[in-house]
């Protein structure tokens, strides 16, 4: 998670990386996460052999990373650190209970990472090791808690690499070895530039910087264009299209790399220039300080190049208005409260695309306005209810990205769909927290039976039945069971198989076990109640066959109709847990009276939960992700402060009384011995006493733990409503336009023992083999005396840090999906016409129309995703109010034309509200409207495209749509498997496993499931029957209205820069159309487009112009000349023709050969417009490395992307008198239709006749040298031509600038530092009112 490389921000960096590894270990879903080093509740394999486990008892003194109640919470202070012994402060005292002697022995435990980080902070404070500004801020503050930044996903660098660089091709025969005309001081500034652009450079190109786009991207620049071979793998396309796929793959990989560029620039090594050691030219460009890595820019050639004409050109450009070049410090920003520098601007030699992204990153960080209060709210959401915090507001000195609630919840939903085992990771974090609270721990003394239990056969059978269900106390399983209660569920859970025949009265143990489980864990009970019904029905069939028959006759399942009425199936059917998410319910829990089944109904009422719904108030305050507009968590029980009797204990007494009667009635019916009834009743009374003893621990302590965990960041779904009869979890899916979807909750998901396979027997050790701090305080524990054990308040930094790490890892894991979704979805548009209705209408004014074909292929699929109604069918009688109602209901400004002539008011509404009218076709449009002001003028219309994002009220993304649409037009059609391959290939460069916690998370998440085609993916609810529901703003959260491609605002801003980069002609280098013309070319110019000679006849190619005919006893291709109709069977002697080929489809090889022969023998000029190609300029010393002939171009299949080489012969060496004569002329056939040397910066860096400019030599553009300015809103601007004017934003034009202002952080900004605060724990756990907190 931490990628900071700034040395000044490395405090605790090692501890930060170690923390997740120590606290996040996974153990096959068994709840071990976070319990080895950080928690108090972990036990050794020998747990249960002593009266209390070592780690469990140890928590009474001080748990790892936790603190005691009240004022004792101040572990270490900045002010007292000067006197305290830090080594002693790190020690923790713990106690162990002995089986026979309640004695105390001391044991030393190592501090946890959280504690260590706090100690390190205080030690640094005491030793004057903290940054001076930080020391002032924290002076006098008691520090006992630290939390990592809420968002720390930046890589800090001091020497930024650009996206673009210069590449040079040299002609060695022109090289000179003249000494650089610069002093040693000047050489440090201008040397790299002069050495690169040296005399004899044939061509200087602007290329991608391979140092930034490293080998992991797979980008190959050997042909001068970016190619990636293994990203888009086309299938079912014509041979030859591979190059096109590789080209588009290269664009995509560049785009992704830019979108994920998370670098922040810190001030590195700088120099203050000494003016008397530098030349005047260098002095004039340097500021008060400059970055030591100056970089390369043509402006630095001024006065230092041996090429006279180039020096003069550069000098002239730098002296003209509108070009200002400089290096070094341009601006400084201060924290005016503490009077220290925070941000500085440096002019660097770096391209404006990279500079823009670097500035965007820093601006996003510095303008997030995250305050200490925001951070404290996050800590409070992970702290025991009523915990208070005090911390300074460090402001701009410790900036953080704002926590993007909407983006995080979308990523969590997508990750849950892709990785069902995400549930286990969240449960692990919650399990670690439960363990650290020391709320419960096992003891070796087992209290399953009363000491004076009767010794007879009935008692023996009872003991056997209990022992068959009650296993040895496993504290990890207990912690896991508690954690599951508030954790999200992404897999259907199942009941662990129970083998019970219910033939003996002692089998009532299983029924009691289920009832206890429903009391302790009502949420988890609800998840497996169907499986439990299967067991209970077997019990009822054995014990109450008559009532069972009545119940089965009504049906074992039911559904709830639209009116809220229960409709029973009338069938005897075994419950299948795959039905848990369906519309069916297990009938035993219907709570509907049933005449003749009174005993069954009475027993089933014992399963009624008695907890309450609590709003996740602290999570809401912390802006944590939640999947509901009303985020609530069901708490199994509430604290009982101020009550005379404990309601939880009273409830169990009712259960005991009911079951005692049930056993008694059964015994009477079967004429059982009195001993059977007596021992069962004795056992139940014993359990009642046990329950009385522990009830206060559950209601007054564990309830607070539950309420605390309900606010944790990753517990983002509502768990249970409290009503077994009606509750179904809200089900969300990731949809695609083709109608398929991927559910968030899997009906047939992962099966993990302890996580999704639920063992209800866990209730027995909880009841009979565990102790609790409040129980020990009351004197009812195994100690038999009151032990004032301290309540443990875990450090919230542990779970918050783990949650933040998981959220950021998941965001990275889903980023490749989001990126491909954006590319396949962004830029969707529908072709439309705007019919003008007024004489003076502008192009975009009038009534918008499209056709049904466009509607069905583009708009209707989106309506299908959201399941909204079809737009209204309008007729001549339609009113504006009816149209407005349809637009409001569908959220789409579209209507469907049906018939009639649309009246004036309706026409006016359509025009003024820009409603899109879907027509059968465009024939006779004017006759279908009566416009109030004027008739549509002569069918005047303007053709354009309407963005789908605009139709669906997502206009904030239109800025990227045009570029994305152009990119998509280049892509082949991809199947779901191909899309999945592309996502997986991109995922290889996301660096998710760059930290130990990331590696652990990946390992735990397991296999990725991606059956869904990520295109126009949205998050939608579904009904239990699987029907996808449209977005409902009364139910669904705002984040689900539209997925925003699953990208956050910062990623989208970078993406916009990346799109401009790959669309820039100097980078894209993709061209259309070539001219075939037979010419001699002794001095080749790659950009030369030969003119059409006078007298040539323009002809449009058509198949009918070329036919087969018999001539001179041979079949020949005959050309028919359109102006005269004369046939020419021979390519020789044909009229001079300028043939334009718009579409080559269907052209045979014979015709192509004939046309080329006409070019050679009759001097035809042929323009082929539908060819696409990339171009590479070759120098004389390179020569051609590949050859594409004209015939291949004419007969190639559609979709093939050619790579054509063009020679630049400007620096071809002059032949000497001793060179042999040429054997023939240089003939050339293929020419571009537009200049192709777009990547060129300079050409022919040599002197002609030692002084003059060679013909065709090119100097760099002044834009490459213009530093310009950085605007207040963060835009890089070119220098204005005139004073008072605003400069042109550099991103809005196709020029490329290699001198730009980059904003940098000073060492005063501490982005990687933890935030240190003082935590004040509640004084009394029993005084916390979790209902009103």
Curated annotation (Swiss-Prot):
GO terms for cellular component: T=2 icosahedral viral capsid; viral inner capsid. Its main location: virion. InterPro entries: VP1/VP3_C (IPR049422), VP1_protrusion (IPR049421). The keyword Protease does not apply. Keywords: Capsid protein, Inner capsid protein, T=2 icosahedral capsid protein, Virion. The keyword Acyltransferase does not apply. It is found in: Virion. Residues 11-20 have a biased composition (Basic and acidic residues). Residues 1-10, 64-82 have a biased composition (Polar residues). Residues 1-93 are annotated as: Disordered. Homodecamer; each decamer is made up of two conformers of VP2, called VP2A and VP2B. 12 homodecamers assemble to form an icosahedral capsid. Inner capsid protein that self-assembles to form an icosahedral capsid with a T=2 symmetry, which consists of 120 copies of VP2, with channels at each of its five-fold vertices. This capsid constitutes the innermost concentric layer of the viral mature particle. Belongs to the turreted BTV-fold inner capsid family. This is Inner capsid protein VP1. It comes from Lymantria dispar cypovirus 1 (isolate Rao) (LdCPV-1).
């Amino acid at each position: 998670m931490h990628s900071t490389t700034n040395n000044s921000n490395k405090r605790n960096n090692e501890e930060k990386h170690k923390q997740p590894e120590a606290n996040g270990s996974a153990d096959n879903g068994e709840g071990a996460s976070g319990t080895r080093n950080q928690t108090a509740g972990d036990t050794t394999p020998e747990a249960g052999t002593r009266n209390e486990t070592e780690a469990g008892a140890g928590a009474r003194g001080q748990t790892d990373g936790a603190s005691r109640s009240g004022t004792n919470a101040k572990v270490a202070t900045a002010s007292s650190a000067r006197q305290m012994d830090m080594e002693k402060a790190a020690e923790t005292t713990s106690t162990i209970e002995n089986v026979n002697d309640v004695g105390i022995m001391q044991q030393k435990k190592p501090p946890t990472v959280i504690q260590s980080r706090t100690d390190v902070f205080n030690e640094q404070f005491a030793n004057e090791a903290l940054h001076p500004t930080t020391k002032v801020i924290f002076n006098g503050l008691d520090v006992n808690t630290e939390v990592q930044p809420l968002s720390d996903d930046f890589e800090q660098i001091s020497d930024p690499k650009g996206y673009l660089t210069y590449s040079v091709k040299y002609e060695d025969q022109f090289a000179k070895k003249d000494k650089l005309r610069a002093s040693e001081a000047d050489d440090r500034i201008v040397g790299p530039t002069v050495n690169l652009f040296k005399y004899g450079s044939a061509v200087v190109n602007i290329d991608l910087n391979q140092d930034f786009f490293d080998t992991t991207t797979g980008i190959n620049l050997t042909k001068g264009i970016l190619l990636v071979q293994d990203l888009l793998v086309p299938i079912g396309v014509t041979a030859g299209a591979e190059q096109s796929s590789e080209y588009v793959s290269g664009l995509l990989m560049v785009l992704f790399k830019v979108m994920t560029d998370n670098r922040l620039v810190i001030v590195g090594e700088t120099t203050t220039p000494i003016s008397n050691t530098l030349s005047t030219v260098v002095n004039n460009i340097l500021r008060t300080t400059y970055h030591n890595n100056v970089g390369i820019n043509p402006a630095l050639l001024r006065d230092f190049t041996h090429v006279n004409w180039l020096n003069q050109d550069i000098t002239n450009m730098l002296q003209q208005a509108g070009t200002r070049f400089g290096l070094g410090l341009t601006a400084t920003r201060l924290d005016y409260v503490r009077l220290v520098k925070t941000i500085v601007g440096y002019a660097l030699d770096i391209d404006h695309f990279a500079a823009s992204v670097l500035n965007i990153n820093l601006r996003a960080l510095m303008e997030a306005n995250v305050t200490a209060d925001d951070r404290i709210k996050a800590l409070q959401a992970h702290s025991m209810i009523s915990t208070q915090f005090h911390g300074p507001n460090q402001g701009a000195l410790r900036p953080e990205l704002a926590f993007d609630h909407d983006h995080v919840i979308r990523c969590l939903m997508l990750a849950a769909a892709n990785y069902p085992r995400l549930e286990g990771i969240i449960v692990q974090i919650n399990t670690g927290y439960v363990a650290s609270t020391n709320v419960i721990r096992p003891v070796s003394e087992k209290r399953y039976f009363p000491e004076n239990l009767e010794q007879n056969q009935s008692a023996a059978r009872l003991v056997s039945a209990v022992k068959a269900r009650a296993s040895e106390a496993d504290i990890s399983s207990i912690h896991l069971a508690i954690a599951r209660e508030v954790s999200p569920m992404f897999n259907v859970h199942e009941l662990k198989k129970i083998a019970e025949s219910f033939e003996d009265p002692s089998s009532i143990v299983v029924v009691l076990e289920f009832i206890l489980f429903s009391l302790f864990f009502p949420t988890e009970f609800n998840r497996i109640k169907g499986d439990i019904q299967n067991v209970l029905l077997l019990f009822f069939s054995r014990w109450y066959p008559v009532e069972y028959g009545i119940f089965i006759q009504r049906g074992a399942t039911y559904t709830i109709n639209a009116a809220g009425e229960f409709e029973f199936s009338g069938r005897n059917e075994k419950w299948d847990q795959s039905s848990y998410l369906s519309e069916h319910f297990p009938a035993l829990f219907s709570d509907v009276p049933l005449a003749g089944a009174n005993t069954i109904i009475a027993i089933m009422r014992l399963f009624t939960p008695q907890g309450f719904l609590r709003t996740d108030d602290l999570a809401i305050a912390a802006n944590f992700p939640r999947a509901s507009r009303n985020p609530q968590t069901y708490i199994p029980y509430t604290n009982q402060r101020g009550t005379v009797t404990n309601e939880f204990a009273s409830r169990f007494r009712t259960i005991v009384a009911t079951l005692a009667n049930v056993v008694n009635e059964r015994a009477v019916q079967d004429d059982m011995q009195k001993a059977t009834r007596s021992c069962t009743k004795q056992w139940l009374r014993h359990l009642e006493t046990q329950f009385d003893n522990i009830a206060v621990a559950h209601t007054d302590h564990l309830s607070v733990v539950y309420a605390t965990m309900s606010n944790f960041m990753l517990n983002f779904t509502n768990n249970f409503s409290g009503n077994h009869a009606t509750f179904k979890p809200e089900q969300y899916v990731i949809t695609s336009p083709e109608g398929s979807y991927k559910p968030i909750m899997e009906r047939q998901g992962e099966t993990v023992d302890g996580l999704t396979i639920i063992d209800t027997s866990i209730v027995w050790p909880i009841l009979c083999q565990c102790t609790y701090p409040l129980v020990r305080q009351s004197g009812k524990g195994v100690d038999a005396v009151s032990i004032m054990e301290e309540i443990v308040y875990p450090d919230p930094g542990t779970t918050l840090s783990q949650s933040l790490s998981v959220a950021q890892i998941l965001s990275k894991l889903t980023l490749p999906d989001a990126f491909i979704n954006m590319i396949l979805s962004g830029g969707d548009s529908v072709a439309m016409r705007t019919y003008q209705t007024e004489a003076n209408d502008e192009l975009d004014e009038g009534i918008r129309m499209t056709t049904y074909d466009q509607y069905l292929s583009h708009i209707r699929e989106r309506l299908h995703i959201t399941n909204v109604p079809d737009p209204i069918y309008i007729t001549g009688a339609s009113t504006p109010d009816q149209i407005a109602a349809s637009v409001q209901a569908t959220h789409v400004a579209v209507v469907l034309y049906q018939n009639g002539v649309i009246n004036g008011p309706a026409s006016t509404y359509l025009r003024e509200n820009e409603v899109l009218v879907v027509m059968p076709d465009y024939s006779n449009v004017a006759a279908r409207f009566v416009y109030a002001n004027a008739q549509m003028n002569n069918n005047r219309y303007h053709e354009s495209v309407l963005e789908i994002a605009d139709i669906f009220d997502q206009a904030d993304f239109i800025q990227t749509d045009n570029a994305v649409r152009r990119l998509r037009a280049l892509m082949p059609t991809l199947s779901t498997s191909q899309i999945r391959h592309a996502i997986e290939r991109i995922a290889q460069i996301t660096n998710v496993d760059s930290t130990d916690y990331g590696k652990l998370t990946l390992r735990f998440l397991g296999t990725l499931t991606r059956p869904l085609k990520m295109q126009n993916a949205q998050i939608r609810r579904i009904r239990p029957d699987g029907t996808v529901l449209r977005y409902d703003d009364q139910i669904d959260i705002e984040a689900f209205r539209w997925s925003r491609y699953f990208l956050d605002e910062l990623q989208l801003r970078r993406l916009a820069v990346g799109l401009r980069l790959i669309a820039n002609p100097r980078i894209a280098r993709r061209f259309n159309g070539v001219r075939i013309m037979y010419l001699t070319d002794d001095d080749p110019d790659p950009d030369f487009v030969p003119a059409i000679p006078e007298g040539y006849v323009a002809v449009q190619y058509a198949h009918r112009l070329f036919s087969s005919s018999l001539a001179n006893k041979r079949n020949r291709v005959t050309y028919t000349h359109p102006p005269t109709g004369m046939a020419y069977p021979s390519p020789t002697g044909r009229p001079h023709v300028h043939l334009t080929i718009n579409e080559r489809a269907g052209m045979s090889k014979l015709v192509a050969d004939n046309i080329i022969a006409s070019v050679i023998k009759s001097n035809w000029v042929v323009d082929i417009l539908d060819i696409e190609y990339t171009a590479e300029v070759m120098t004389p010393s390179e020569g051609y490395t590949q050859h594409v002939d004209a015939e291949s171009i004419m007969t190639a299949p559609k979709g093939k992307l050619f790579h054509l080489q063009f020679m630049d012969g400007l620096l071809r060496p002059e032949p000497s008198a001793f060179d042999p004569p040429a054997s023939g002329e240089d003939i050339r056939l293929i020419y571009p239709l537009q200049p192709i040397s777009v990547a060129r910066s300079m050409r022919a860096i040599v002197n002609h006749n030692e002084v003059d400019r060679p013909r065709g030599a090119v100097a760099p553009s002044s834009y490459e040298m213009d530093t310009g300015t950085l605007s207040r809103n963060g835009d890089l601007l070119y220098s204005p031509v005139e004073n008072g004017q605003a400069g042109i934003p550099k991103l809005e034009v196709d020029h490329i600038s290699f001198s730009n202002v980059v904003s940098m952080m000073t060492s005063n900004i501490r982005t990687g530092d933890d935030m240190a605060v003082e935590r004040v724990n509640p004084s009394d756990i029993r005084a916390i009112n979790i209902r009103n907190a």
